[in-house]
Each structure stands twice: as C-alpha cells, then as structure tokens.
Amino acid sequence: MPFTFKLFHVDDSRCGMPVSTDGVLLGAWAPLVQAKTILDIGAGSGLLSLMAAQRSQAKITAIELDNDAALDCQQNFDASHWSERLEIICCDIQAYCQREQARQFDHIICNPPYFANGPQSSKFSRATARHTDSLSFDALLQAIKQLLAPEGQASLILPTESVSLLEAILSTYNLRLCHKLLAASVEGKAPNRQILVLGHDLKAKKIHNFGTELQAVAQQQLYIREKTGHYSLAFTLLSQDFYLKL
C-alpha cells in the first residue's frame, strides 16, 4: 500500500514487506552523522535509504534480492528529491560482496529477515522478506565485516528473541556491539525490538571482567506508544520529520 511521508512517497505494492514501524524506527534512530557512504542491505521498497537520504548528504547504495521489490525501490528513488544520491542494485548480498571486494561504506543499515523457522507465508516474496532463509545472520555479518569501513558502524533492528543468536556469533566476524536501543511497543511492556549498532572489534575501550575483555556498550530504552495509545514523546521526536501527522 502506498505510504506518503513529509518529504517522500513509498510505493510498496510489489514488495514482500510493507512500510512498518520497525523500519521507521531504525531509519530515524540509526547514527548516520558524518556518514558519506551508506549501504542498505535488503532494501525492499527503499524506505531506509530514503530516510537516510533525508537525514544525511551521503551517497546511498541499496541492495535488494527480489526483482519486484527492486522495481518499487527504483521507482521510489526516482520520484524522490535525492535520486542523484540513491542507487538500487538487484542481487543478493553475497554476489555483491564478490563483485565489490574493495568497496567499503561508512554506515550499513539493515532490517533483516526475522523468522528463523516456522510456517512460510503464502506469498513467496513476503515469506522471503520475513524468513532468515534468504539472509542468514552469518551471511549478514560476513557482509558487514567485508563492506564496513574500519571506523564505520552498522545498524540492525531485530526482535528481542533473536538478538542473543546474533550476539553469540559477533566475535566470529571480529565485530562488536557498540550501542543498543531497547524498544517496547507500549509503555510498561517488555522490549520486543532492539536496534543494535555494530562496529569492527578494534580493541579500543575495554572493561576487564574475570580475565575476559569486554567492550563497553551504551544502552537506551524507548517505548513507541503510551498506555493511552498515543505515540510517546520520544518516538514523536524521532519520527516527526517523517510522519505527516506529527
């Protein structure tokens, strides 16, 4: 269903996953300050890329596996104010890594597939967008390891129940957790989404704990709606540059 924001329009009619609060939260919160190049892995309709273009002056490359979604993405890019800074490439991230072995980005953003197993959706493209079969955590982290600039950061949004699976394999790819946002859908509820900001493990700032070196991780919390059903002040401040009615 087409979705109109303050400065751009998103047509996701051919895309497996529609515009979501998850995407808006990640696009609004990701720390993009001073990023000159941004990579959007699994771009879908291009929402994250368009939000990044509005928030920065970066050159943005979007990678999307599904051809129909890539067509939506290209259409949305062409209709935006920032078309000269946006490009969409239709391929999987592994193929892109092989083709662009020397290229690196200041920031990587990704709203990855989040169902590791379970029944597939009746619509194949929606199933592909929702299941990690199309982009495993190992494949994602390998791509981040290769494509992220030495001082760059990668921002991902995941369901809380999937976070430990990803965190457990970060060290395998010499990546570390730098920052975490715990997001609850409603005030008083447990966080059901987390944004993880990753970086290369450069052994910069450490805390020693029982002989094991641990990196200090900044952590924030946010709830999207108050108990009344209205958007919280924190989410309103984050998203007011994008949503029409805020």
From Swiss-Prot:
Its main location: cytoplasm. It comes from the Bacteria. This is tRNA1(Val) (adenine(37)-N6)-methyltransferase. Specifically methylates the adenine in position 37 of tRNA(1)(Val) (anticodon cmo5UAC). Keywords: Cytoplasm, Methyltransferase, S-adenosyl-L-methionine, Transferase, tRNA processing. InterPro entries: DNA_methylase_N6_adenine_CS, rRNA_Ade_Mease_Trfase_CS, SAM-dependent_MTases_sf, Small_mtfrase_dom, tRNA_Adenine-N(6)_MTase, tRNA_adenine-N6_MeTrfase. HAMAP family: tRNA_methyltr_YfiC. It comes from Shewanella halifaxensis (strain HAW-EB4). It is an enzyme of class 2 (transferase). Gene3D superfamilies: Vaccinia Virus protein VP39. It is found in: Cytoplasm. CDD domains: AdoMet_MTases. One of its GO terms (molecular function) is nucleic acid binding. It holds the Pfam family MTS. The keyword Cytoplasm applies. One of its GO terms (cellular component) is cytoplasm. GO terms for biological process: tRNA processing. Belongs to the methyltransferase superfamily. tRNA (adenine-N(6)-)-methyltransferase family. It catalyses: adenosine(37) in tRNA1(Val) + S-adenosyl-L-methionine = N(6)-methyladenosine(37) in tRNA1(Val) + S-adenosyl-L-homocysteine + H(+). Its EC number is 2.1.1.223. The lineage of its organism: Bacteria, Pseudomonadati, Pseudomonadota, Gammaproteobacteria, Alteromonadales.
